[in-house]
Swiss-Prot record:
EC number: 3.6.5.3
Domain tr-type G, chain residue ranges per copy: 10-206
Organism: Hyphomonas neptunium (strain ATCC 15444)
One Pfam family per UniProt: GTP_EFTU_D2
UniProt protein name: Elongation factor Tu 2
UniProt subcellular location: Cytoplasm
Function: GTP hydrolase that promotes the GTP-dependent binding of aminoacyl-tRNA to the A-site of ribosomes during protein biosynthesis.
Residues covered by region (G5): 174-176
Keyword S-adenosyl-L-methionine among record annotations: no
GO cellular component: cytosol
Key words of the record: Cytoplasm, Elongation factor, GTP-binding, Hydrolase, Magnesium, Metal-binding, Nucleotide-binding, Protein biosynthesis
Enzyme class: hydrolase
Binding site for Mg(2+): T26
InterPro entries in alphabetical order: EF-Tu_GTP-bd, EF-Tu_GTPase, EFTu-like_2, EFTU_2, G_TR_CS, P-loop_NTPase, Small_GTP-bd, T_Tr_GTP-bd_dom
Amino acid sequence: MGKAKFERNKPHVNIGTIGHVDHGKTTLTAAITITLAKTGGATAKNYADIDAAPEEKARGITINTAHVEYETPARHYAHVDCPGHADYVKNMITGAAQMDGAILVCSAADGPMPQTREHILLARQVGVPALVVFLNKVDMVDDEELLELVEMEVRELLSSYNFPGDDIPIIKGSALAAVEDRNPEIGQDRILELMKAVDEYIPTPERPLDKPFLMPVEDVFSISGRGTVVTGRVEQGIVKVGEEIEIVGIRPTVKTTCTGVEMFRKLLDQGQAGDNIGALLRGVDREGVERGQVLCKPGSITPHTLFEAEAYILTKEEGGRHTPFFTNYRPQFYFRTTDVTGIVKLPEDKEMVLPGDNVKMDVELINPIAMDKGLRFAIREGGRTVGAGVVSEIKK
């Protein structure tokens, strides 16, 4: 399917519902589809359809995720909802379901709970750019002052994790009322208000095509009389023949020129996001570039060895470790196309990490890797995946 374009006249945005168990994430997801179905913007789905989330694998980890899609007059959305807390943790850390924004669901009757906190923290750590809040189950709270108190608490919580708590839209309503098509003043009217807030407040993501050129190196060939060809899938941006590019990671950064782009044995004048290409590099010998490096627009990404990460460690049942690990644990970190050994340093208050935990940790790699905040990786021991992580901060 080389160049088939996905025809769509509206901007596409990936979102999801997050929040504490039983606060109404799945009911809200159903409510959105049922409400938007009235104007032809969705196929109505009930709670049971969404709750029976199929299993999928991402970076060797099994995750249950339900996907629904719908549209507003302004945008097309792909929406993810997970049945269990562990699925959320895994989903957000592996980036299995990319989130350009999220709807934080919080029960007005209970206020913020432990997983409300944890999901906000995860959203911050994995780089979810914006949140909108749905304060659910308002029909279970008779006291207007109590409602205001919960709203204040949610705003303070968001601010404490460096989200703009004072500015984030908070919509109050009842997802169940919308699903049952009653009390529109707290039901479907509020769902429409929520979607308007999502349309306006969650920024349209930059398309991969508009980002600076980046291609992870998968293979390197030498073609006699022509030079060195590097193959891989262009992750983002465009590379044009004749442009200067950099080779970054593992060894010192090298500048070169792309003198040719091949795809399916045809010569092209450029390669773009999504293309599997061979890039011909000027003046680079076969030994000068290796799998695990990236080709990129000069200056757009830099190599690093020390970073903070948020990681999820697989349980024994998921095929992970059977025992905990401690500071100075030395697994391999699989970035894009290659493994690099790294040393783990745990936070002061964390003596050990048990299988099934998610944890913040510092990692020092023995070789530098081209990285940005938000880069995903797998944690492996002898080729077996034992965890997944995301770069939350670059330190060196």
